[in-house]
């Protein structure tokens, strides 16, 4: 993680605390803070919203993303670290999903590198469809920082490069994790490709698309009841063209903060291998 200068920090997304874990390497390496791009709905929350603004995260309106895009570019050029979840939503398969192009476009426009952060174990603390494992439960969360990736001006090609790098880094990190803690056949938090009971990437994509369409229908029904024009998918895509990737194009992350490790100390406990960290589950 660079100790100075701006960088996009794409983080793989498997759990609800990823925004905390994803900021740990930067904090440990120069006490830098990562400002995450987060969906407007989080800022609208009466509890989370004020905290997000105080921590100077970037609000993303997924139907009008231009303002957030320009703000992110401004901060990157000023030397900030901007975090993003390029998969847009939590990956139920715990594999790397298709990435949105926003990360590459932001990095290219700002003239900064993409520095991927890969983690494994966060889904064991709290993820979609499963109970929280909070408190001093000693769940190991491994975090690894990848090599900086320069952009070329071709957002599609750069996004593929980023995807391939993140997928390879995640694969190796999981093997190292299993080597340390052993196999977990049938475990909900283990990918199907490694013998777990998580859905495959294809199965997870079907589930996500179904839920996405249900959300659109629910939102449009509410708009119609209020006498307003439904937005549908078309206007969602129009919004993407105006300044982002539309629905979750900049990710759906939350705020960045300081995690408390399982031993009660701030931050994380260093683990073997350069660029690795191990985080305990946060205290509540």
Stretches with model-predicted labels:
Residues 3-64:
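Catalytic core of membrane glycerolipid acyltransferases/transacylases, capturing the structured
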Residues 1-2, 74:
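Short amphipathic alpha-helix with an adjacent loop that forms part of the alpha/beta core around
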Residues 66-284:
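Non-catalytic C-terminal accessory region of glycerolipid acyltransferases
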């Amino acid at each position: 993680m660079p100790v100075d200068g701006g960088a996009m920090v794409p983080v793989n997304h498997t759990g609800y605390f990823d925004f905390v874990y994803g900021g740990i390497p930067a904090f440990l390496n120069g006490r830098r803070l990562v400002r995450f791009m987060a969906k407007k709905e989080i800022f609208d929350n009466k509890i989370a919203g004020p905290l997000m603004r105080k921590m100077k995260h970037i609000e993303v309106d997924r139907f009008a993303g231009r303002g957030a895009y320009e703000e992110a570019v401004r901060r990157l050029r000023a030397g900030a670290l901007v975090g993003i979840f390029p998969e847009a939503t939590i990956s139920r398969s715990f594999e790397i999903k298709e990435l949105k192009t926003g990360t590459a476009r932001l990095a290219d426009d700002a003239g900064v590198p993409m520095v991927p952060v890969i983690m494994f174990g966060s889904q064991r603390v709290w993820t979609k469809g499963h109970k929280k494992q909070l408190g001093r439960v000693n769940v190991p969360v491994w975090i690894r920082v990848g090599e900086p990736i320069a952009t070329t001006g071709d957002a599609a090609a750069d996004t593929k490069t980023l995807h391939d790098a993140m997928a390879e880094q995640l694969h190796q990190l999981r093997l190292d994790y299993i080597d340390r803690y052993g196999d977990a056949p049938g475990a909900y938090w283990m990918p199907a490709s490694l013998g777990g009971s998580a859905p495959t990437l294809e199965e997870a994509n079907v589930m996500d698309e179904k839920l996405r369409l249900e959300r659109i229908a629910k939102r449009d029904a509410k708009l119609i009841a209020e006498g307003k024009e439904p937005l549908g998918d078309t206007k969602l895509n129009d919004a993407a063209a105006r300044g982002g990737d539309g629905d979750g194009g900049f990710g759906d992350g939350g705020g960045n903060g300081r995690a408390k490790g399982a031993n009660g100390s701030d931050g994380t406990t260093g683990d073997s291998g350069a660029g690795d960290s191990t985080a305990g589950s946060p205290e509540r």
